[in-house]
């Protein structure tokens, strides 16, 4: 693809789409490149996104966001970006299908939630396998929940779920517990059962969990799983161009979402922000405003802003007598 864009956004989730919308409305030449694999796509129903009181499927939310951005002349391309490099004063982006160049780049590639080691569990993602208590606990009130994990975070999840249901089990899935003494005491105090044996199989109907089968041969009826196995931020592109990461592998940004590389920005779940769709969208807007301001200031420095049609007579070369005249 020829020509240097003002902005290229890598990632088509909520952060990328929100940034695209703002940049399009700022009349910036913007290209959004996405791989079609946003985690939001797999959410069967998003209930905590403002403006959708009846909920909305994650895929529908992405489709609406794309349609809205395209209205403001944002171009969208489906490609898998393989590398980002600095080339002079611009960035060179190599995709699997095409190459691209831009003055500014926003990385909004998100992360991948790691599913638990349970056969067949991936078919339950977004329907009865969940990764975020703040996102999904409300819909599971009174249901039978199993939290799969072995650390303090897993215990915190189990304790937090007691606000929504008393039917909570903590499953180690064949691993050794690593939580501290305080957390062990809370498990005992609140009488949360802990199962250590591995989960060998699950039964579901179109992604809706029905039963779990444990290594000892017992089966337990369950309605949903939460896992605290962890996440993998998609930050490799930022590393390749020299951006700094934190200890969790997330891209370090400042309050304007600037990375340690001038001209390179990051937003959404690939940064240390709380990974929520509405927060990602807000970060996308912040990054877009920062990028727009950055480009504006560069235009001022280089004297490349569009010229006014109503320039003063002195600007046209007429004598300047110090008076302002109106016609």
Located regions from the model:
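Conserved FAD-binding catalytic core of PHBH/FMO-like flavoproteins
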Residues: 125, 130-164, 169
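FAD-site-proximal beta/loop scaffold in flavoenzymes
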Residues: 117, 123-139, 229-278, 286, ...
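Glycine/Thr-rich phosphate-binding loops of Rossmann-like dinucleotide-binding domains
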Residues: 41, 115-116, 155-156, 222, ...
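Beta1-alpha1 glycine-rich phosphate/pyrophosphate-binding loop at the start
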Residues: 5-63, 68, 152-177
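FAD-binding core/adjacent interface of flavoenzyme oxidoreductases
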Residues: 1-8, 76-143, 251-255, 259
